[in-house]
């Protein structure tokens, strides 16, 4: 079911950055300040027009909302079909916010080919939003591929020393995964025609398919390779540290905060609901790869001497935690996985911004080059402290909420898996606290650091929304979780045929398994006895309990 929009809000959100990019084509490349003002103006406008998604989203319905539908390529059944639920709405808000912050952070950092730089950033913004709103699989794939081009040029032109190598590596890894994913899309497309006689790329119809297990298995593998590269999961992660290290600050921020979420979004939106039986069969494999990623990413991060590379490997570890929660296949685990995606975008995006601040001043990312910065840049040190604590999951900050939900979701499925996940959290705290101690505390041994300027008003403005969100989600996550309930219910109804949300109206409590409605209230009220067990314990193949 879907609610058709009377006003094309999603198209407005999606194409606002594109309008800005087109407008920049007509501005002289020598008018650099004009270019910066236009790019920042359209980025902020894109965020402002996306805010109605927060206020107008109907949390009581599982229908797709703000739907727009037009015929696109009727000969093959492709449509301009877009819409959102709570999950995609939150990711759109994250994309528009982080895009605005990334563009603002580039004001003084980019001095060459300024016009092209901002055009690529705005095109990237349109591609990200388009992927999150697409309900037509071919349309989704088009936007998925569109994102590759601007990011390739952002790394290859405005990156650091090994930018060409990193850009090509990023492009090839993602392209290979995309081609394999396309084969899976076509398999679902032709199977749908075989059983219904209708050619369509309609994702909502694909969610209703009951494909044979053998076909599900192969399609899941194709989707897995496409999405796992994007997450990235171990062992498909090797492009990420290079891309992060050599990308300009804005590129790293968008890559960490939004682009990595394309992979996890794909799993939740496509793999789990379209291929439920194959999903359950692959659970042990995905979980163990996630656990390896959590531990491996943390251990390698501890060995880094490059500030940016350390944060890059922390992303491998954190996204492994996201995948672990997702493939617990429990309402709490999936909810925690989505919340942690938002949290990772906030904290890791903030950390890359912080690296960019000192790199712009010193043009080095070597951790050994710094020390005692809290004495010279107290405001910077304070912001870095909050982002560090957010990243390691300190209670009262956003990272804690996602991690505790994931651990709750995975614990009753398999306690060994939960123990490995907890180990990753401890290691994460170790390398982040080590980084903070090495860079912020001690004496200022390097004379080049003595004259470093603290955060400017513009720089502090880029961190302000991230600080607010880190505290808001940490203290009161309910508004975010409430917006996810129906999205999680839709996925759970497919991966578990016996699942029923609380708001399904079951006559007897034992007839319904909690998971819908107010998830936090359920956890508060059912953390003992059979209540909590019903909330998180769901049948999953291949996992011991």
Give residue ranges: language-model regions.
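Alpha-helical multi-pass transmembrane bundles of energy-transducing inner-membrane proteins
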Residues: 30-32, 116-123, 128-215, 300-313, ...
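Transmembrane helix-loop-helix hairpins at membrane boundaries of multipass inner-membrane proteins
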Residues: 1-9, 23-119, 194-210, 510-540
């Amino acid at each position: 079911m879907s609610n058709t929009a009377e006003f094309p809000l999603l198209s407005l959100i999606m194409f606002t950055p594109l309008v800005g990019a087109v407008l920049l084509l007509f501005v002289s490349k020598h008018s650099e300040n004009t270019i910066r003002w236009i790019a920042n103006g359209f980025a902020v406008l894109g965020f402002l027009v996306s805010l109605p998604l927060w206020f107008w989203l109907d949390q009581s319905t599982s229908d797709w909302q703000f739907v727009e539908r037009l015929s696109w390529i009727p000969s093959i059944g492709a449509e301009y079909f877009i819409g959102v639920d709570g999950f995609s709405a939150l990711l759109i808000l994250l994309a528009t916010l982080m895009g605005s912050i990334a563009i603002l952070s580039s004001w003084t950092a980019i001095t060459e080919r300024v016009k092209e730089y901002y055009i690529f950033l705005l095109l990237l913004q349109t591609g990200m939003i388009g992927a999150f709103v697409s309900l037509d699989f071919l349309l989704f794939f088009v936007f998925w591929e569109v994102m590759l081009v601007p990011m390739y040029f952002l790394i290859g032109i405005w990156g650091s020393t090994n930018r060409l190598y990193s850009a090509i590596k990023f492009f090839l890894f993602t392209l290979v995964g995309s081609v394999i994913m396309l084969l899976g899309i076509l398999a679902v497309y032709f199977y749908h025609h075989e059983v219904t006689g209708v050619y369509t790329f309609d994702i909502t119809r694909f969610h209703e398919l009951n494909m044979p297990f053998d076909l599900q298995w192969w399609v899941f593998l194709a989707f897995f390779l496409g999405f796992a590269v994007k997450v990235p999961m171990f062992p498909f992660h090797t492009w990420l540290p290079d891309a992060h290290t050599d990308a300009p600050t804005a590129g790293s921020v968008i890559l960490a905060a939004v682009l990595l979420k394309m992979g996890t979004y794909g799993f939740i939106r496509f793999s789990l609901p379209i291929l439920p039986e194959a999903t359950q069969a692959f659970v042990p494999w995905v979980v163990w790869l996630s656990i390896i990623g959590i531990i491996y990413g943390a251990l390698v991060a501890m060995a880094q001497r490059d500030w940016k590379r350390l944060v890059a490997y922390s992303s491998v570890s954190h996204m492994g935690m996201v995948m672990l929660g997702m493939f617990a296949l429990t309402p709490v685990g999936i909810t925690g996985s989505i919340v942690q995606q938002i949290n990772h975008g906030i904290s890791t995006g903030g950390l890359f911004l912080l690296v960019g601040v000192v790199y712009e001043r010193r043009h080095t990312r070597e951790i050994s080059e710094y020390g005692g910065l809290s004495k010279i840049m107290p405001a910077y040190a304070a912001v870095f402290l909050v982002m560090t604590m957010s990243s390691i999951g300190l209670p009262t900050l956003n990272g804690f909420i996602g991690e505790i939900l994931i651990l709750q979701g995975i614990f009753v499925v398999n306690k060994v898996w939960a123990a490995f996940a907890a180990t990753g959290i401890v290691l994460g705290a170790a390398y982040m606290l080590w980084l903070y101690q090495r860079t912020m505390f001690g004496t200022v041994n390097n004379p080049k650091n003595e004259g470093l300027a603290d955060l400017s008003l513009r720089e502090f403005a880029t961190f302000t929304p991230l600080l607010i969100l880190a505290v808001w989600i940490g203290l009161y996550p309910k508004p975010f979780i409430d917006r996810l309930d129906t999205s999680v219910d839709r996925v759970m109804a497919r991966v578990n045929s016996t699942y029923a949300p609380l708001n399904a109206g079951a006559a007897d409590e034992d007839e319904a398994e909690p998971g819908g409605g107010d998830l936090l209230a359920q956890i508060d009220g059912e953390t003992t006895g059979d209540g909590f067990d019903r909330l998180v314990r769901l049948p999953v193949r291949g996992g011991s309990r």
